[in-house]
């Protein structure tokens, strides 16, 4: 993964001050918010479909510092996508969520605005997230020229038993 520039590092540092890592307790619903920044690769499968992988890092409530991989398929004519968020916390616990998304152009050439709605998978998540449920919305910008993305997410997560 490419090194993040100072602007991205600064943005993550600001969010770190706002998004203190916590933990969920059985039966409690908690906010799930954070930010991410990373690199994007895409491979054309056919004229209408790209296979895209985001490899990023960030900080979030409930996760703390994390790495995330986001493999997904993009339907180019409709600008829609479907795939998975695979968060890995510093201790190795994993939070998995399926998502669908929509991309729209911005006023900046080569930069796309993306909104993705994700649902946490209680069966695929591990460690303290095993059995957890919830959902979140990711809003991010994708710079197709630089091959980078930066964004934030907000939602809720509940521990097993909720």
Regions found by a protein language model. Give the residues of each.
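Beta-strand-enriched cores of mature, soluble protein domains
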Residues: 25-162
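Bacterial N-terminal signal peptides
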Residues: 9-19
């Amino acid at each position: 993964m490419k090194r993040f520039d100072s602007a991205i590092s600064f943005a993550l540092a600001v969010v770190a001050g706002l998004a203190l890592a916590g933990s969920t307790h059985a039966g409690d619903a908690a906010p799930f918010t954070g930010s991410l920044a990373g690199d994007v690769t895409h491979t054309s499968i056919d004229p209408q479909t790209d296979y895209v992988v985001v490899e990023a890092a960030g900080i979030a409530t409930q996760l703390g510092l994390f790495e995330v991989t986001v493999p997904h398929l993009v339907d180019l004519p409709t600008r829609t996508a479907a795939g998975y968020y695979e968060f890995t916390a510093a201790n190795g616990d994993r939070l998995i969520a399926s998502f669908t998304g929509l991309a729209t152009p911005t006023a900046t050439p080569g930069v796309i605005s993306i909104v993705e709605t994700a649902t946490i998978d209680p069966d695929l998540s591990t460690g303290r997230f095993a059995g957890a449920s919830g959902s979140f919305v990711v809003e991010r910008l994708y710079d197709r020229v630089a091959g980078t993305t930066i964004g934030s997410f907000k939602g809720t997560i509940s521990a097993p038993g909720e």
